[in-house]
Amino acid sequence: MITSVKKQGYDIIVVGGGIAGCCAALAAARENKSVLLVEKHINLGGLATIGLISWFEPLCDGEGRKMMGGMAEEMIRLAVGCGYDNLPEIWGGTSGNAQSSDRYSTHFSPTFFSLALDDILRKNGVTILYDALATYPKVDNNVIVGITVENIDGRLLYPCKAVIDCTGDAAVASRAGVPTRTYDNTQTYVVHDTNRRHAAEFVDSGNMTKLRHWQWFKPGAETIGEVTAAIENDYLRRSKQMTLAYYVGTDKNEREILTLPELPQIRLLRAIVGAETFLGRVEDIDKHVANSIGS
């Protein structure tokens, strides 16, 4: 029988080091809480970095008015602080490679953004535990009081006062018995590649987004329902086969895949059933949410 070794406790444990998890950990640390961030991969940023969706959605309304600030704006600044960008000049862009529109949005370097996330969390006192899988929460009287983690050291129990589930599929909440629901997903697969033509365009323009090119694939049906392990692995198998088939037969000395995604690029897996749900879909356009804290 494998027993759990009890480790140091924390005020807050954040499970999942995607953008949401990083923001949650940073916010908690700035409130002088002791924070442990548990991440199963070895780099931060989730879908935005190791998932290769390195595009920051607009923070404006399309008419020159900023609609979001706070940590969202802090993250877009962090994303372009050390790596390339194509942020418009009116929003502080300095690359000279802005998009044709003036939206407050940008492409960014997924690698530099991941490193920047690690840096800002450590500077704010967050303890990061990489290459660690949060398996099951410890629940006492319907309250999560700890997280069981498995890594190279074995099975560890980290006590806590509160847990923030940023796994992307409500893994902690679901295993604690919290009601959850699933959503339909569009199947896409993105890799970053380059070739001789892209390199020439970069040399001519100095625009790094010309060199790091997104290549999209559609490995299956338009939508899938609940994502199981079998469905996820089938999606990954088809995605990899489709990707390889696309490049086979092209000149191997003219092109290169720069990066493959290190996690499934699935947007909606499972979520906690909240008091209110707003997805921004067509059916939500006229929906009024009285307790919205956004714009």
Enumerate the language-model features and the residues they cover.
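Short, hydrophobic/aromatic-rich segments at coil-to-beta transitions
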Residues: 141-147
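Basic/polar N-terminal segments that are highly enriched at the extreme N-terminus
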Residues: 1-5
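Loop/turn elements at helix/coil->beta-strand transitions in domains of secreted/extracellular proteins
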Residues: 9-11, 31-34, 124-127, 156, ...
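Flavin (FAD/FMN)-binding glycine-rich loop and adjacent Rossmann-like elements that form
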Residues: 47-48, 71, 114, 131, ...
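Conserved N-terminal/central alpha/beta ligand/cofactor-binding core
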Residues: 27, 33-34, 39-136, 140, ...
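N-terminal Rossmann-fold NAD(P) dinucleotide-binding loop
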Residues: 21
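Beta1/beta-strand and adjacent pyrophosphate-binding region of the FAD-binding site
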Residues: 6-18
